[in-house]
Swiss-Prot record:
Organism: Bacillus subtilis (strain 168)
Keyword Membrane: yes
Protein name: Uncharacterized membrane protein YuiD
Membrane topology reported for the UniProt record: Multi-pass membrane protein
Record key words, sorted: Cell membrane, Membrane, Transmembrane, Transmembrane helix
Transmembrane spans: 10-30, 137-157
Length: 158
């Protein structure tokens, strides 16, 4: 089956898995807290999106050359993805932080204004996910992860 021998695809998937798994020990080193939920979460160091798109572009470059149209498409796709990770998604995460604080402050105000006996209802309120985007350094190391991992895989499998 050709899908199972598609080097750019496989290197991109390997980069996603590697970047997601490596987030756990990196966060442990920084915070001394073991958080396995990072394996399936967005945001954090390194950016798995950046690792994936740079691995894809590197794999395409190795297979088809830097002068191919396919590389041009994958490179532009990578740039847009990494720009989005540091721009729109990061700002959405910052907005989620502010909105969550507003909800907490509003609930505190309501509780102080009157005796609010519905604690169970308050606990059911959904918080917005705040870790959506990436700091530029996370995107940089995600991209570097994708490139280096693909070069290592190419050495062994191409």
């Amino acid at each position: 089956m050709e899908l199972l021998t598609n080097f750019p695809l496989l290197s991109s998937l390997a980069a996603i898995i590697f970047a997601q798994v490596i987030k756990v020990p990196i966060q442990f080193i920084v915070s001394r807290k073991l958080d396995w939920s990072l394996v399936t979460s967005t945001g954090g160091m390194p950016s798995s999106h950046s690792a994936a798109v740079t691995a894809l572009s590197t794999g395409v470059a190795l297979e088809h050359g830097l002068d191919s149209s396919l590389f041009a498409v994958s490179a532009i796709f990578a740039v847009i993805t990494m720009f989005d990770a540091t721009g729109v998604r990061r700002h959405a995460g910052e907005q989620a932080t502010v909105i969550n604080k507003l909800v907490i402050d509003f609930n505190r105000f309501v509780n102080e204004a009157k005796d609010f006996p519905k604690a169970a209802e308050k606990e059911k309120q959904k918080k917005l996910k705040e870790l959506l985007g990436h700091q530029p350094i996370e995107v940089f190391f995600g991209g570097l992860t994708g490139i280096l991992l693909t070069l290592v895989l190419a050495y062994f499998f191409m």
